[in-house]
């Protein structure tokens, strides 16, 4: 049964829905994360594939979101890391990321999540969806990106499986954002389907907040 929020004192909750690569894949990504001076590299706690950024909502809407995602039914996804690239902002490199393939199964899951969120009043996603894992955030003081892209252009991992979806709360701080898992939603297995009802994390688990700063 979906548990309510744990009662943190925040009046609003900054939420997003994501897939978390398994530890061996995260380790491989971290090993490649170097070579751009001034980059804000992600740490292990921050590596994820965002399915849907929700943004700031009040407590009641947050509880509605957590409950709505309990209706998610979707298959597990076999995926792999395939190459690196970047996003630009105002003509400057803004973010370095690793691609995830095949894209369509992840995009299909993104659409299902979006449909469930619309049922509880979250606006439909209008931005194009590109499955990726953010590796670093850049600013005007960051060094050249081209050497990193050239070195890691063929970055690849063995196939792995996304077995569940997680609802996260993002807490902004002076050192950057910290991501707290709120509820986990298993995806259906490839043979015997498992229940997609949410398994909310206990208050104790949530209170053991990871130390992370993007």
Segments from the language model and where they lie:
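Histidine-dependent nucleotide/RNA phosphoesterase domain, centered on the 2H-phosphoesterase fold
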Residues: 2-204, 214
């Amino acid at each position: 049964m979906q548990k309510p929020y744990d009662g943190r004192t925040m009046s609003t909750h900054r939420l997003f829905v994501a897939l978390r690569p398994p530890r061996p894949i995260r380790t491989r990504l971290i090993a490649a994360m170097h070579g751009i001076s001034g980059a804000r590299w992600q740490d292990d706690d921050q590596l994820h594939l965002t399915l849907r950024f929700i943004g700031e909502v009040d407590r009641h809407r947050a509880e509605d979101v957590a409950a709505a995602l309990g209706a998610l039914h979707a298959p597990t996804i076999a995926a792999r890391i395939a190459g690196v690239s970047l996003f630009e902002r105002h003509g400057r490199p803004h973010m370095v990321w690793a691609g995830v393939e095949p894209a369509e199964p992840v995009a299909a899951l993104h659409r299902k999540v979006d449909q469930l969120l619309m049922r509880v009043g979250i606006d439909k996603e209008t931005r194009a969806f590109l499955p990726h894992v953010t590796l670093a955030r850049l600013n005007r003081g960051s060094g050249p990106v081209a050497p990193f892209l050239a070195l890691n252009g063929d970055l690849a991992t063995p196939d792995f499986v996304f077995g569940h979806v997680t609802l996260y709360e993002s807490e902004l701080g002076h050192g950057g954002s910290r991501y707290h898992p709120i509820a986990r939603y298993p995806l259906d297995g490839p043979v015997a389907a498992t229940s997609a009802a949410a398994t909310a994390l206990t208050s104790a688990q949530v209170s053991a907040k990871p130390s992370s700063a993007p």
